[in-house]
């Protein structure tokens, strides 16, 4: 049928010949139509980059909104709701044939369950740290996890660290010191009970330290365990969220206060709908991050994706200044800038390592990984 159509386009109709001049002109070849606008839009590299950055900011801001309530203490319940929302969302996408992942297998679940426990420790301590710290400080301190992961790779997987990577680590530590100093300085100089504010910050720093340890343990453990399961793309997300739901349900009912008075404090009538909506949206945002990161890698490149992950630190930190009452001072802004530069230097160091021979290069930066694995690593750092 297509061949017939092409033939007809160049057929000369005899009754249209100019018999006087004995000349004739064939109709102009038909212009090949472009792809549909939707396909062109989907392949535009700007759109997936903006979508990835937006979903990262959305997740952080929604979590902070829920946790910033003065009396919110149902962290395990929040994480459970997010896991349930995530499972419902990806299962719906699978049923609609938008994504694919393997069906549940009990043997694979047993192999993956220890990683799920590490994940629960990571997301719980992360929620506690975000509850006590501002988004900019939380984002800056999250960079320290990169250092722990890098040296974990050196110790357990025989990797190495380049000079540029070490320089980026130094900038990360410096930005964290500046951020902590700016926070404590603002707490001491501001009106109100300075001692209570400093105590709150110290609690946040302790939770942040524990979170960095849990996050690095999770990433390193997942790297080793994934060789046994050969999980791809959304497989990891499916098992992580599915296996964490029963554990989180047990923890929330055993360790958290479910009295009517405490529920009223956590979900005041005036803000109840907004809090529940934010909890659901934060669960969906984790799906958005995985999907948009895979989209970003497919449309652009892994190099561009690495740079986007580094540049994404700045808008996430700025979102805390815009949407919440994070102090805007010269030291706090300086900490954000230094942390932003450290992320760029680290991304450039990773790109240069990837361009070199594989001998003696950190495994975390050299071997190809799936888009979901890469996005998970970056989302943990954001």
From Swiss-Prot:
GO biological process entries: transmembrane transport
Subcellular location field: Golgi apparatus membrane; Cytoplasmic vesicle membrane; Endoplasmic reticulum membrane
InterPro entries per record: SCL35B1-4/HUT1, TPT_transporter
Chief localization: Golgi
SUPFAM superfamilies membership: Multidrug resistance efflux transporter EmrE (SSF103481)
GO CC annotations on file: cytoplasmic vesicle membrane; endoplasmic reticulum membrane; Golgi membrane
Chain segments annotated as transmembrane: 41-61, 72-92, 111-127, 135-151, 161-182, 201-221, 234-254, 275-295, 304-324, 328-348
Superkingdom: Eukaryota
Biased amino acid composition, Polar residues: 367-382
Keywords (A to Z) from UniProt: Cytoplasmic vesicle, Endoplasmic reticulum, Golgi apparatus, Membrane, Sugar transport, Transmembrane, Transmembrane helix, Transport
Chain positions covered by the region annotation Disordered: 358-382
Lumenal topological segments: 62-71, 128-134, 183-200, 255-274, 325-327
Membrane-protein topology: Multi-pass membrane protein
Regions of this protein lying in the Cytoplasmic compartment: 1-40, 93-110, 152-160, 222-233, 296-303, 349-382
PANTHER family: SOLUTE CARRIER FAMILY 35 (PTHR11132)
Similarity annotation: Belongs to the TPT transporter family. SLC35D subfamily.
Reported function: Involved in the import of GDP-mannose from the cytoplasm into the Golgi lumen.
Assembly: Homooligomer.
Protein name, UniProt field: GDP-mannose transporter 1
Higher taxonomy: Eukaryota, Fungi, Dikarya, Ascomycota, Pezizomycotina
UniProt gene name: gmt1
């Amino acid at each position: 049928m297509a061949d017939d159509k092409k033939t007809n386009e160049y057929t000369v109709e005899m009754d249209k010949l100019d018999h006087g001049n004995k000349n004739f002109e064939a109709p102009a070849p038909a212009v090949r139509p472009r792809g549909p606008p939707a396909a062109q839009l989907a392949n535009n590299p700007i759109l997936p980059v903006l979508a990835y950055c937006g979903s990262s900011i959305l997740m952080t801001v929604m979590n902070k909104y829920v946790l910033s309530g003065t009396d919110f203490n149902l962290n395990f319940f929040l994480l459970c709701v997010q896991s349930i929302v995530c499972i419902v969302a990806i299962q719906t996408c699978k049923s609609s044939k938008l994504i694919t992942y393997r069906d549940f297998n009990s043997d694979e679940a047993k192999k993956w369950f220890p990683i799920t426990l590490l994940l629960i420790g990571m997301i719980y301590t992360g929620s506690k740290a975000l509850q006590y710290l501002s988004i900019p400080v939380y984002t800056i301190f999250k960079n320290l996890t990169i250092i722990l992961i890098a040296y974990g790779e050196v110790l357990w997987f025989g990797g190495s660290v380049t000079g540029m990577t070490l320089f980026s680590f130094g900038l990360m530590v410096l930005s964290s010191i500046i951020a902590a100093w700016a926070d404590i300085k603002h707490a001491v100089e501001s009106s109100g009970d300075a001692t209570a504010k400093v105590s709150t910050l110290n609690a946040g720093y302790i939770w942040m330290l524990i979170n960095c340890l849990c996050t690095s343990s999770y990433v390193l453990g997942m790297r080793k365990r994934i060789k046994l399961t050969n999980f791809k793309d959304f497989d990891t997300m499916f098992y992580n969220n599915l296996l964490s739901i029963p554990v989180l349900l047990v923890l929330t009912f055993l360790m958290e206060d479910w009295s009517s008075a405490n529920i009223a404090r956590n979900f005041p009538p005036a803000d109840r709908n907004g809090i529940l909506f934010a909890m659901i949206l934060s669960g969906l945002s984790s799906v958005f991050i995985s999907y948009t990161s895979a989209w970003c890698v497919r449309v652009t490149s892994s190099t561009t994706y690495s740079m986007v992950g580094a540049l994404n630190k700045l808008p996430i930190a700025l979102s805390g200044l815009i949407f919440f009452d994070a102090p805007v001072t010269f030291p706090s802004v300086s900490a954000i800038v230094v942390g932003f530069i450290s992320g760029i230097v680290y991304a450039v160091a990773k790109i240069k390592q990837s361009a070199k021979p594989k001998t003696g290069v950190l495994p975390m930066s050299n071997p190809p990984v799936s888009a979901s694995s890469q996005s998970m690593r970056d989302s943990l750092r954001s």
